[in-house]
Amino acid sequence: MALETFVNSEPFTFGVELEIQVVNTHNYDLTKAASDLMRLIQGETFPGNITPEITESMIELSTGICHSHEQAVSELHAIRDVLVKAADQLNVGLCGGGTHAFQQWSDRQIYDAPRFQYISELYGYLAKQFTVFGQHVHIGCPDPDSALFLLHSMSRFIPHFIALSASSPFVQNVDTGFHSARLNSVFAFPLSGRAPFVLTWDSFEEYFTKMVNTGVVNSMKDFYWDIRPKPGYGTIEVRVMDTPLSVDRAAAIACYIQTLARYLLTDRPLKLSEDDYLVYTFNRFEACRFGLEGTCVNPQTGERRTIAEDILDTLDRIAPHAAALGSRAALDEIGALAKARVNDASWLRTVFKQEKSLNETVRQQCLRWRE
């Protein structure tokens, strides 16, 4: 199969995708209701899209093409409200969070769609264990070479996105010690990790053709990279975030990525080298394990600082681009999180400490989702 033609898109436009948990309102475990939700929303009018995901306990919402923070917030609220109304009719709950706190993966049912059934047959129990919930952000790129430049430039900031969105401290009734345990489920897939270090679309097409010829992949969907090109949309897709507990947090993180993209592609402050990836896995682990308190190492200078400090320094550098995009309010929210060194994982742990019940913790997640 040939690689799709890269469709040039308007630079720095963006789209947000959120995978949402569907829970019962008895004990707040995951429940099988995605098909029923999809039936109920037929005929409803809303921006963007709502689609099923790999198991019946997940559903995905996505915005249209957004230009501003204000638009993203408006669209996410509108889609969220349609889903909440349908969920109320079914007496089920919806919530964010990168993992469900106490679900048993073996109870999951694969959604009846050809691709999901194919994944289940190929990956076995990993498909059911993949009942984890992420935020993806697409960024528009003017041409394919710019997309690859942005992909590799953005890779240095992966720890920021993980730490800011982290909302998966609990797995199967256990506090994992991680801020984002969700990404540990992604690591199990053979085509996860980072994209190959190629900087021209011709070279990328050559790589893709070789992979297809091995029989390992059929399309870009088979790559579970942290950031991957989406040629049919003319975007790069940042895929490392947990689904936040509120749509407002999701919009703020998306606009941080948008603003960073404008800075990286307009100012071109970085000279890219494959050696940038020497500390990639270490920095990524630190963000997953310790959140904003984690350490990140500058691959060129060797300087070590906390992820929170690196975010605050980055916010100063990209401030002029925030002004141009109208994303100052979003970046103020990001700055407040970095200064306080708190994220949704911190909030979940605080609730559990107070309530001594993961069932009650998930119930409060559902309340947060409606705010």
UniProtKB/Swiss-Prot annotation:
GO BP term (any one): modified amino acid biosynthetic process
Listed EC numbers: 6.3.2.2
Source taxon at top rank: Bacteria
Keywords noted in UniProt: ATP-binding, Ligase, Nucleotide-binding
Any GO molecular function: glutamate-cysteine ligase activity
Catalysed conversion reaction: L-cysteine + L-glutamate + ATP = gamma-L-glutamyl-L-cysteine + ADP + phosphate + H(+)
One Pfam family here: GCS2
Family as reported in the entry's similarity comment: Belongs to the glutamate--cysteine ligase type 2 family. YbdK subfamily.
Function: ATP-dependent carboxylate-amine ligase which exhibits weak glutamate--cysteine ligase activity.
PANTHER family: GLUTAMATE--CYSTEINE LIGASE 2-RELATED (PTHR36510:SF1)
Protein name according to UniProt: Putative glutamate--cysteine ligase 2
Biological source species: Burkholderia ambifaria (strain MC40-6)
